[in-house]
Amino acid sequence: MAWDDPLDFKKEGIVLDYKTAGVDIDAGNEFVEKLREKAPGIGGFGGMIKIPSGYDEPILVSGADGVGTKLSICRVANDFTTIGQDLVAMCVNDVITCGANPLYFLDYISTQKVDNNVADIMIGIMKGCEIAGCDLLGGETAEHPRQIHYDMAGFCTGIVEKKKVIDGSAIKPSDRVIGLASSGLHSNGYSIVNYLLTRHQIFYADHPELLTPTTIYAPVVKRLLDEGDWIYGMSHITGGGIPENLPRCLPEGLTARVDYNAWSVPEIFKKIQLKGNVDKEEMKRVFNLGIGYCVVVPANRLELTMDIIRDEGINCWEIGEVYESS
């Protein structure tokens, strides 16, 4: 038989359908129906949402992100219960930096088959949306039979009044930088972590905090913005660490000097640096080192801002000051 001759499925007794090819449509439909019990709006061809009232010139702000190789830790631990919250956090924390309130979230999950792990991921996504105060408007769960591992992406849209957009233009020399505590690694630097795991330098059983979900800063940011208009800039500390993310909220001609001794770096980062023999500057460029989000405020609002942040249950420190670039 030539390589391009068709197989005789009838002779072999094969009735080819999607399930035989590896995609179970019925299981997928059942999965969607279960999701509808907690998120009634999903399942249509497109999600719809009404623009909230009270805006004169509403601006929509959108962002997309993923969780990177943190998914590999989920596989090692066989625990997918928190990674959905990470996905929401990575998107929401970006969108709120300009002062936007999260409005809705969409997800994309690619999997070999719809199983309990996918259900756990979705539960985490719904929990993340609840914390962020946004609607889960829809998404796509794609079955790829030849795919070995899971992959996922998230998409978030927020809304802000045009005149209240925070773009860093109000930042001036002498303004202070407040660092908000992270819950751990969040969702960055896991390629180094996975390398250390494969080289048996660290073990997940000794460090379950590797799966601690990323902090969602939307509630505390909303509180700060509701309290007044003195938040001049905000930055989500992700890949690139403070050195590459904090400057993104500063106007041209200004820089921030950060005191890395202003807070205590969590032990997990010290362990990674020690076991991997990672250079100190590389640690700063890869990991958040305990600071997951930054806000820039005038010096006379420093203490008030920090009091509000702590009142919301998040620790914080004055970690830097704004100067003119030399």
Stretches with model-predicted labels:
Residues 99-101, 192, 230, 315:
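Short loop/turn motifs at secondary-structure junctions
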Residues 49-54, 59, 67-68, 86-87, ...:
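Glycine-rich anion-binding loops of enzyme active sites
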